[in-house]
Amino acid sequence: MISCGARLAPFDIAELREIMSYDEMELDKIGDRKTALFLIMSDTDTTFNFVIAMLQSQLFNLLCDKADDEYGGRLPVHVRVIADEFANIGQIPQFDKLIATIRSREISASIILQSQSQLKAIGIVKKSVVVKTH
């Protein structure tokens, strides 16, 4: 219970509860039409990084379900997620499995990290891999 309470503590902030109480982002429209969505987080305060991770997790789940249920497995408009500072947003559950299954649904994800060690730190890979760098 203590761990649960600690994780939910940010919801004691009225402004966060307000933001999370309704949907004005229309994530369900992404994949139907060309859309640009920018998620900006603080680089000095990690308190709300979990909100970005939750949103991205929900977005991937929503898009996969939408592709399967409404479009026979492929979205009409390709969705490309470019996740800069990916290691700093928090964990997206089963992201390693997710990136292996989204491509067939017209969804792609490019994650941008500062170092190879961040791949291990966020749990995407268990051992060293070759990564193309510029």
Residue ranges of each PLM-predicted region?
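P-loop NTPase motor domains
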Residues: 1-107
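Conserved ATP-driven motor cores of ASCE-family P-loop NTPases powering translocation/secretion/packaging/pilus
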Residues: 98-134
